[in-house]
Amino acid sequence: MIELAQIQRIAKKPLEQVLFDMKMAGLETIPGGGAEVFSDRVQSDLFWTKADSEEWLRIASIAHQCGLPSNATMLYGHIENSEEKVYHLTRLREVQDETSGFLAYIPLSFHPERTELEHLPMPSGCLDLKEIAI
């Protein structure tokens, strides 16, 4: 999703026009990455250079309204807490209720090696199973 914001800036066109052009060129779905976790706290601590949660959700909604379904993702296993994960899922659910545009929910496990958070343990298999079960 966040790549679409960059394409829009470079093209200097409205997002709807960018999506229309991409659809006419053969785009059928959008991967939906870059959501990370919808939390202002996490965003400001870890992902401050990326588009924020509201931008991601706005792009997803517009893409779905333009007839381009997507996946929904959440990056887990870093500094997020349970409440932030529930909030993330709730926001995804709201967009899904409005647009019916998400094809799949994909939980993505954080890999801390070679990052500022390499002191954190890898998410456990148990946590992976819990996230998938959601």
Predicted regions: what they are:
Residues 2-14, 45-50:
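Active-site mouth loops of central-metabolism enzymes
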Residues 11, 48, 74, 108, ...:
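Glycine- and other small-residue-rich loops at beta-strand/loop junctions that grip anionic moieties
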Residues 20-35, 54-116, 127-134:
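Conserved C-terminal portion of the radical SAM core fold
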Residues 40-42:
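Gly-rich Lys/Arg/Thr-decorated short loops/hinges at beta-loop-alpha junctions or inter-strand turns
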